[in-house]
Amino acid sequence: MGVYHADALVIRSREYGESDRLLTLFSREYGKIQAVAKGVRKPKSRQRAGAQLFTYAEYLLHKGKSLDTVNQVSPRESFPHLWTDLDMSMAATAMAELLDLATLPGQPHPELFTLTFSSLFLVESCDPALVQCTYALKLMNYLGYRPRLVECAECGQRVQGERLLFSPDAGGVVCRQCQTQGSSPAVGRWVSGGSLGLMRQLLQGELEKLNRLRWNQWSKKEILEVSQYFCEQTLDKSLRSWSMGNRLVNVGQNPSGKDDLNERRDVDGTGES
C-alpha cells in the first residue's frame, strides 16, 4: 500500500521540524495513523486546515516506514463550536487524549470512531462533562474493561449503600464486607450511591438520550474524578487534560455540608477517610 485514502479525525497535532506538523489521525478503516503534514505551518499552506485539532477530513496519505505523509487533504468538518466554549474544548481534548492513549496504530476500531465523532457533536447540546464521562465509560467497555457497577466485583452480590468503594483493580465497586477481607484490602475511591446510579445510566444508555439526564455539581466532580481514576489505573497512563479539566470544575458542597475536597481521598479499604 503506497498511497491510500482515509477519512479521519485529527486527535493530536503538534509541531514537527521547522514548518511541519505531526498528526495523530483516527480513521474508521485503519484506526490510528501517525502522519507528517509538511509545510502546514507556513501561512500560505493549502493543507493548513487539515492539520488543526478535531478536523475531520479526507486524507490522501503516502505509506512510510515509521511515519506516513499527508499528500492531500479535503476538510469536511471542523467542529467550530469546540473553539467557542472552554468546557466543550476541554471535554473534546480529554476524549481525544483518552482515545490516543487507549489505542495502537493500525488497529481499526470502527465503533470507537463512531463514538468519538458523535461525542464531538454532542458536547454542543449536552453538558460537556456528562458527554466526557459517558465517552470514557463506553470506550473502556468497548476495549473489554466494563466496570461492574451493579454487583460487587469481588463476591457478585448486589451492592447497596450511600457510599461504596470503586476499585479499578477489582473491576468495579466493592461491597463493605469484601473491602477488608483477605490479606490485601481493596484499594480505590469512594463514590456516592447517586453518582453510581448515574454512572450506570451513562454506561448503558444511548448517546442520543444524554440530554435527558441531570446531575448536580457534586455528582459532576465525583464522576469526573472516578472516571479519570478508572481509566488511568486500568490503562496505567496519566490523563493530563482530564486533570486540567477537573480543576476547572467548581466545587460545591455535598448534602451533609462538608467540603467536597475533604471527602475526595484515596482509601486503602480499611476506612472511609
From Swiss-Prot:
Disulfide bond as UniProt keyword: no
One Pfam family it belongs to: RecO_N
Biased composition (Basic and acidic residues): 257-273
InterPro entries linked to this entry: ARFGAP/RecO, DNA_rep/recomb_RecO_N, NA-bd_OB-fold, RecO, RecO_C
Entry keywords, A to Z: DNA damage, DNA recombination, DNA repair
Superkingdom as given in the UniProt entry: Bacteria
A biological-process GO annotation: double-strand break repair
A Gene Ontology term for the protein's cellular component: bacterial nucleoid
Region of interest (Disordered), residue spans: 250-273
Family: Belongs to the RecO family.
Known role: Involved in DNA repair and RecF pathway recombination.
Matching NCBIfam families: reco
Protein name listed in UniProt: DNA repair protein RecO
Annotated organism of origin: Desulfitobacterium hafniense (strain DSM 10664 / DCB-2)
